[in-house]
Amino acid sequence: MGFVLPASFPGASSITTGGSCLRSKQYAKNYYASSYVTTLWHKKGKIQKEYCAVIFSRHNLKQHYKVNEGGSTSKECEKKYVVNAISEQSFEYEPQARDPKNIWGSVNDALDTFYKFCRPYAIFSVVLGATFKSLVAVERLSDLSLAFFIGWLQVVVAVICIHIFDVGLNQLCDIEIDKINKPDLPLASGNLSFRNVVIITASSLILGLGFAWIVGSWPLFWTVFICCMFAAAYNVDLPLLRWKKYPVLTAISFIANVAVTRSLGFFLHMQTCVFKRPTTFPRPLIFCTAIVSIYAIVIALFKDIPDMEGDEKFGIQSLSLRLGPKRVFWICVSLLEMAYGVTILVGATSPILWSKIITVLGHAILASVLWYHAKSTDLTSNVVLQSFYMFIWKLHTAEYCLIPLFR
């Protein structure tokens, strides 16, 4: 007994089972996908499936198919696949199910792309910074309550939204530059489309402002708004904007955004909205703003050293292009060493013994480690300079750990 599954060709076919012969008419039409004829014979529990796959071009092809009971021939068939299968139960066609491993692989790739898009070295630092800036408002151990934890989570959500908006807008405005300086970024490499990055960036802004509004914290709302406006002024290429072209405006943008706005905003959110205390500006807050301002200047200047090639091509006159990478490198190192020296002197005046010891000893260690790395850095290697830039971010993170301990 013969079982025949007709192929999905447009037109009629004459099928003869008694004579063990199937003849198909000639077709002279344009096809843009491969078609196949499947003939199944059931004999002693065995199924023989024969596929004749035809790749049709945009030219007219005449194809003749002749399918016999014992075999299959094709006069003008470019590819032929024969599959022998043995089955004793069912001869019905069953669609292939999706491989869960492939689905998980796609999800994993998407998460990895988003992870790279967010620049993990920076997002870790900003979240840690927001955490320790929130701790500045803690006056006693009893302040570390559930209310503090909820307020801290609110700050973390806000700062992540700010960060994603910042990096997203930067990549949107610097696509061509990043293809030279940072070709591994998702947008520059093509792993993320321009449209998707626009959606992610706009969503982070809306989510940040909406979240702060729902929480009912005006310090948090204005922190998100002002930080995003500084990010736009720094990146967007419009009249009076695109501050990254000018070293002084770049430094001002980083100080105002990272040091002043975030330090004050997160502290006031915890102080007034979480702890319900009057607005004050304690000594740790002033120290936090001052030391983070130095780091903001150093990061703003140093980040352009590995990016000189792309900046020069697109007319961005960074300080590294004006003074040279070596001079800017040692300016950044000197600024950090001076900041550590001043911090050691100020920390020594603390009336609290444990705060005095931690502040002096901690910054002395940071200063020593920085000097050791600076002396062994090859200033002619762009890879080494990029590595040193990552090292500055690590120092920045370590500084955040010391800030709440300054009293």
From Swiss-Prot:
Membrane topology of the entry: Multi-pass membrane protein
Keywords: Chloroplast, Membrane, Plastid, Transferase, Transit peptide, Transmembrane, Transmembrane helix
Enzyme Commission code: 2.5.1.70
GO CC terms, sorted: chloroplast; chloroplast membrane
Needed cofactors: Mg(2+); Mn(2+)
Entry similarity comment: Belongs to the UbiA prenyltransferase family.
Annotated PANTHER family: HOMOGENTISATE PHYTYLTRANSFERASE 1, CHLOROPLASTIC, HOMOGENTISATE SOLANESYLTRANSFERASE, CHLOROPLASTIC
Name of the protein this chain belongs to: Naringenin 8-dimethylallyltransferase 2, chloroplastic
Native source organism of the sequence: Sophora flavescens (Shrubby sophora)
Lineage summary: Eukaryota, Viridiplantae, Streptophyta, Embryophyta, Tracheophyta
Name of the encoding gene: N8DT-2
